[in-house]
Every structure is written in C-alpha cells, then in structure tokens.
Amino acid sequence: MKPFSSLSFGFAVAILIAAQPACSSKSSGGGGSGGKYGTGGIPSSGGSSGNGGTTAAGGTIGSGGAAGNSGGTTGSMDAAAGGATGTGGTIASGGTIASGGTTGGSGGTTGGPDAGMGGVPGKGGSAAGGAGGSGQDAPQGSGGNTSGTGGAGPGSGGAPLTGGSTGSGGNGLGGNTGTGGAAGGTTGNTDGGTSGVVACPDLPGAERSTLYSITANGAPLFVEKLSKFSPEMQVHYAYASLSGTGAATIAVTVSETFSTYKLSPKSRQISATKSGNTITFSSGPNYLILQVDSKELLFILLDAEETNPPHVGDANVKSLADYTVDNTGATLVTSKIQSAINAASGATQNILYVPPGKYTVGELWLKSNMTMYLACGAILYGSSNTGDFNTGSGGINIEGMQHSLIRMYQIKNTNLLGRGVLDSNGVAIRAAGLNASLLKIEQSSSITVDGIVVRDSSYWNTLSYRSDQVTIQNYKVINCRPTTTTYNNTDGVDFVESTNGTLYNAFLYTGDDGMAPKNEDSNGTINCKNLMHQHIVVYNNSVGCKIGTNSMGQSMDSITFKDVDVVKAGRAMTIEAYDTAVVSNTTFEDIRVEAADSMLINLALDVPPTWRTAADTGVYKDTYFTNVSSDVKQVVSLHGKSSTVNITGVHFSNFTVQGKAITSQTDTDASWDINAYV
C-alpha cells in the first residue's frame, strides 16, 4: 500500500496520550462507587403506612407527623409531607442522640380506619443532618393538617444511614385516604456515600417485566417490558432519578438462570458482582445496558435529580388537571390539551404542568414563550388512528414525514421538560402506513428539550429542521429495532439544516442511525453548522455517529461527536454524503466502540445515490479522529470518488484497536481499505 499524503497520524500526541486511558472519566461521566455520603430517605410512592421512622445516625432532629383530622386528607405528592392522620393521635417520640451526630425524631404509626379514632401521627422523614444535640418531643396531634417534615443539613461524624420513608395518613370514615409525602431526608455531607433514589409512579397500562426486577438502595423500581415491539427486538427498562452526588446500589434479579452478563458502557468501569440470579453494582447518574446471556436487553436509566422543577401552585404554573382531561388513556384528548397549550403561550401561567397519567393524543403543536412540563409518571401516548395526526398545516414533508406527535413550528423560547414519557405508538401507525416523527422542531429558535423519555417513533424520532439554538439533553430514545441487522428508518436525533445545535447526555436505542445531521434542500440556502453531540450512549443497527446520507446544499461544517460510547452499531463512525455539500471540520473525539457489525470507520463518496437526483460532487475536508478506541477489529474504509470528488486531510491521534496503538495506514492491527482518491 502506498503512503497517502492526506492521511496523518499524530505520533507524538499518540505517544503522549497512550499513557492515559482513552476512556478516562470525564466531568460529564456517571458516578462510580466512590466514597460514602450520607443519604436522604428513599422516596416512597405515597409514603409507607404503619411503622414510625428510624433515627438516622448523624441526622438532625426529625419532627413527628402531626395528627390529621377525621377522615385524613391526601398528602401533597410535591412536598416532603406525610398525609394528615386521624384525630386523637399520640405524641411522636423525641429523637435520641445519634452517634457523632444529632438526633432524628421517630414518627408514629398511621391512624386506624374508624373515623381516625386512636390514630397515631404519621412520621416525618428521617434524614442525615447537622450538629448533634438532644432529641426533642414532637408535638401532639390534635386534628391538624400539619405534615411531618424530614430533617436537613450535613452530618457531623455519625455514620450516615438512609432516611425513613414518610407515613401515610389515616382513613377516616367518610373521608379520603391520607397519603404520605414522596420525599425522604436530604443527602448528608460526610465523606463517601450513596444517593437518594426518586422513583416515578408506574405508567398507567405499562406491562411489568417478568424477566427482570430491580431495587435501588433497597427500594423497588418498576421495570417495563415493551412487548409491543414484537416480533422485533423486545426490551425492558427501568428509570429513576438520583439525589446527591454519590452512588446508588443497584440490584438486578433475573427470573431465569444465566451464566454470563455484560454491563455497558464499559468505559464507566462499573464493577458488578453476581450472586445466584442477582447482579449488584453501584452507580451514579448513568444510562446503562445490561446484556444477560442472549436474553432481551435491560436498560437502566438513571438521571441526576431535577433542579428547581415546577410545582402545581407556583404562580407561573397551570395544571392540565384544571381542564378536566381524561388521564386514563381511554379517550382522545388532543383538543383539550391543545387548548391548554394555546392558553399557556405568553401567559403569566406559561408553564403547562402535565400530572401523572396516560393521555391519548394525536398531533400537538407547542407555541412560543411557554413550557410544557411532563411530570414523572405522565405519558402522552399517540393515537392508533393516523387521521388524528393531521391537526394542522405547515412545515416540510421529508420522505413522507409530514406529521409528528409533538410539533414546534416557527416558534421561539419554548421548553419541553420533565421526567415523563412521549410515546408516538409508532408500531401501530407505521403498520397503518404513516411515516411520522415523534418530535419535530421546524424553523424555530431558542428551544430546550430536557429530561424526557421518547419512545416508539414510526420514523425519525427527533428532527430539528432549519432551526437555531436547539438544546436537547438528558434525553432517552427507545425505538423499535429489527431483530436482524437491517434498519427501519427509526433514527434517534437528526439535526437537518440546523445551526448551533446541541445534543448532550443522551441514550439512543434505535433501529437506524443514532445521530445523523443532514442537508435536505438542494437550493442550499441554509446548511448545517456548529452541531455538538456529546456524552452519548448508542445501540443500533445502522450507524452510531453519522453525517448524511442526505447532503444537499453547499456545506456541512463544524460537526462534532464527542465522548460517545457505541455499545453496538452496524458502522460506528460514518460520513456518507453523496450529494453536493462540502463536509469540513468534522471531529470524532473520545469515541469508544464496543461492537460494530461491519465497519469501524466509513468515509465514502463512491457509492452512487439510488433515490436522489443531486449531483455527487461533494468533498470531505479535514476530518479528525482523536482518542478513538475499538474493542473490535473492523474495516476502516476511506473511499473518494475521483480526483475532484475526494477526501483530503484525515487526521488520526491516539487511535487504538483492541488495545494496540495504530500509527500508520500500513499497521495491520487495523483493517484498512483506502482507495486512490484519499
């Protein structure tokens, strides 16, 4: 093989970096087991009934729950508050002095069913907390509605323990059942530690997995099986948020016997142990994939706790519940939710809060100057009737993809936030002949999408078209993936003719490309520029990190893929631009490949387009591969088309295959396929 002048290897840089692992931890990486932090209480859905709270070592004085009135009222799910119990409650016992710390007050048990008679106050959540001191008595319940609160503050010497869950209110005759608060104590501040776990309410109608069960810090998480993907790959997933800065202990129990397992991404360097049919490990916020033998995959999706989420009752928040919308999924509620969206745009109450529940909808159009917030446990579920997706006009039709579950068309300053779920029911509407994305952002600016799970798109899941300053983060994509190595057009996130876009901290499980910026318009009036894809986990059948295939227009410039774990893909990194655009200043940096079915790297210009009419005249200039490592030896294919339609300036720095440094294109530790036009 002759040397190619346009191919460069950074020898000095490679030697310098080789002493440091290419998959070293980064600021955005998930937490390891680390030291031990004092933890807050594990949130319980609605609070546990009966037993009083346990005194936390190093905790502050927890206040006892106040007695509720006859027929206790429902406790707030938004606050760390237990529901009110029945009258006649006894005084909660005072806390005892914690070892090296302060005392935590123990709570009482809940009221009985008979009009609250003889009820004992619900306890306050225990917590790791401040300086030690003597315990004090909790106030006597006297029919009041005061809720028990968890202690707060840093621990000071005592060994941190998990704070207790809150107590439930009594069920008085003729009254509503009181419900315990959802929050536990706050995380302590001693060295080392574990995170508190905030679990979502179960999604209405979700199918519980019979293969996997999970606990986080001992609390069960709901594991959903997406069997609707059958006969294609069926998957299971669990989701939670972690409070604090430490790690949670995750235990996964498999109902069937198994011998091997793999936890990915491997770059997280999480040590797991197997005991019987249970796998245990510690992790901070991370998006993880567990492969057990050849069984169906399990996704464990752990986010950091939300910062300042909206609450019902805030001056700028309007709840969807105020519109008497069916939250069981039994009826179509598109028009009611659209009315609520329209009312929020530019209003004082410009945050539309979607509470837990299932809402069956067709196409919805978000508006400027508003926020839609999906609470944990809320799901907007697409109708199976394709006609319900034709609710408006405007926007581009790409490959028959005119409609979407959520539309943002010619708007600005709009947010889509929360820990809820969007599911476009793609399997059903694809079978009915409709190509529809799940989220379509068109000709819009200053858009933020944060935290949600987006599932089952019939076509490209998330599309940003001719938009500027779109930020998508903490994003979980779960699409249908074929059982074979074929693909079904269910891309993850595609920036199309967009500028200054960011995809950060995302999980992309797709049946086609994970990320694939494109140019669609042959006129070339707007082109892709300044696009960042960073801290991503990818598992798919096609390409992990890709530019193309559509590459119309004049240019595609400054596109970066950084800190990406390709757990599995057909091809890991690809530029496949067969049209007219000059693709320049492309960066693949800190890319870690665990599996690639056919190619590790594929830069191609010599494959004729089969379904487009644009001239194949594009070129690739200055493509950088920096800190790229692969566990598999697959083909590195670099193919130009001619002396003018060619590839120039391909730069490798710290490129390793199966642990071996690649220092030239003649190095046999990599599998090279380079033609004369590179």
Predicted stretch roles:
Residues 1-11:
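Bacterial N-terminal signal peptides that target proteins for export
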Residues 2, 20, 42, 112, ...:
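Intrinsic-disorder/low-complexity coil detector
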Residues 10-20:
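Bacterial N-terminal signal peptides
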Residues 19-195:
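Ser/Thr-rich, Pro/Gly/Ala-heavy low-complexity intrinsically disordered linkers and tails
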Residues 196-678:
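Extracellular/periplasmic carbohydrate-active domains that bind, remodel
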